[in-house]
Amino acid sequence: MIMKRLVSLFVLLAALTFESLACTSAIVAPQRSSEGVPLLWKHRDNARYTNTRIEYISDGRYAYTAVVPNTEKYDKGVYAGVNEKGLGVISTATKNLPEATPEEYKACTLSRMSGGVMWNALRKCATIDELEELLKKTKRSRRSHSNFGVGDASGAVAYFEVWDLGYRRYDVSTSGNNGFDVRSNFSHAGDPKKLGSSKRRYDLIMKEMAEHKGNFAPQNFIDYSRSYNSIKYGNVLDDDSYYYCSNHTVPRASTVGVFVVVCDGKCPRMLVMNGHSVSSIAVPVYVQAGSNIPECVHGDAMRLLSNDFREKAYTSVNKKKLLNKEVVRSVLRIKQPKMDMPKETPVDIHAFNANIDKLFAKHEKRVRKVLSKF
């Protein structure tokens, strides 16, 4: 009886908080990548856990650079990352995969949630196949309902739809999508009657990527993360009404970060926004640079600017989600600083990062000037 109540409580809490855990993602094969290696994109939404930073960690077989909670422990909270071997991993929450029974639930441990799976993968695995072996070994000890996007230096790239007692692998090479694939907050292996409202974001990105000519560059995904396009309403910023349905667009009130992982064995790297995609800038970080990470994403500056933007741009009245579109339009009009991401770690990484922080400081000043008018 106690176990049944525990499971019921967990399901209820999951239902209540799922909206805040939603994300949008895509993976790209080497032949469609401007970098010649797999790309992984995660647009992270999480209204509860917004306090993150970019960190270099060497607590296992392989060192890695990852998005982690602003704490001293990472075993439950890696949100995206890439290790020194070029293995990259991202995830999105999913709600239509099989649930464990009360009896099976006893064998699952909360320490194996999606953040823990990614933490273990980055520190222990060099290839997709090694990550798959990790999933097999943790089959009866994990508590995870996630879509994991994974790429490695060999060029292999796939989604793993993972639940407590099983998983299914979807290689991009067999997806039929011309070198890419997309996931939001449902799984193809799950119940087709429970796709949820995130299907709108899935359809949007599938459409925009299908229409894209040529290869995909990391900046293309930053653009997707800053676009208020929707399938049903077009660009919602073109309508002056305050009301909008947040699940129709990629950026939302709950947006807390954007990460494009480059699975390059010679120079593993990421393009990151540690904050809302509208108010932030995209910053390159390199695993080979170790702990030399731009302070604007290693510290609090970008995240705090994001919080201030969110307060001005989003609100809710009588359960209706409202968007101050003039705030969003005004911030989007601010020209993003030109930010190159070299395919080799810069020789003078200190000067490289110092310039990034200088550019962000100027950007932050411009954004705050705009926000002060509202």
Q: What kind of feature is each model-predicted range?
A:
Residues 6-16:
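Sec-dependent N-terminal signal peptides
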Residues 127-136, 239-245:
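Charged, amphipathic alpha-helical segments
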Residues 17-22:
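Sec/Tat signal peptide C-region and signal peptidase I cleavage site
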Residues 24-87, 91-123, 143-146, 152-374:
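C-terminal, well-structured catalytic/ligand-binding subdomain of enzymes
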Residues 130-150:
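Secretory/export targeting leaders with adjacent low-complexity proregions
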Residues 1-4:
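N-terminal secretory signal peptides that target proteins for export/translocation
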